[in-house]
From Swiss-Prot:
Keyword hit for Metal-binding: yes
Pfam families named in the record: Frataxin_Cyay (PF01491)
Transmembrane segments: none
Record-given protein name: Iron-sulfur cluster assembly protein CyaY
NCBIfam families assigned to the protein according to its UniProt record, in alphabetical order: FeS_CyaY (TIGR03421)
Length: 110
């Protein structure tokens, strides 16, 4: 069953808030910018990751140095899953943040 527009926005809003909380609570030198449904995370080494919502596709997109990734929400596991690798958003973020910014963070629940 496809996500309704309202449910999709609620899920993305909640996910972006969780991400902001994780980065804020890390006490690391990270800049967060949120505007028009796009969350940009800037690390002190100048690299960044960008999260954006793709409403027509009901997907959450992640842009990083290693590429662009598209996530569909899986109602059964209640997780965002990469549409290519089937990797959970949280697992991929742990790997990307470590590779890109040499920071070890846990994204539990994502």
């Amino acid at each position: 069953m496809s996500l309704t527009e309202a449910r999709f926005h609620d899920l993305v809003d909640a996910t972006q808030q969780t991400l902001e909380d994780i980065f804020d609570e890390s006490d690391l030198d990270i800049d967060l910018e949120s505007s028009a449904g796009v969350l940009t995370v800037k690390f002190d080494n100048g690299s960044q990751v960008i999260f954006s919502r793709q409403e027509p596709l009901r997907q959450l997109w992640l842009a990083a140095r290693s590429g662009g990734f598209h996530f569909d929400y899986d109602e059964e596991s209640e997780r965002w899953m990469c549409d290519k690798s089937e990797e959970q958003l949280g697992e991929m973020l742990e790997r990307i943040v470590l590779e890109q910014a040499d920071i070890k963070l846990e994204f539990e629940g994502l």
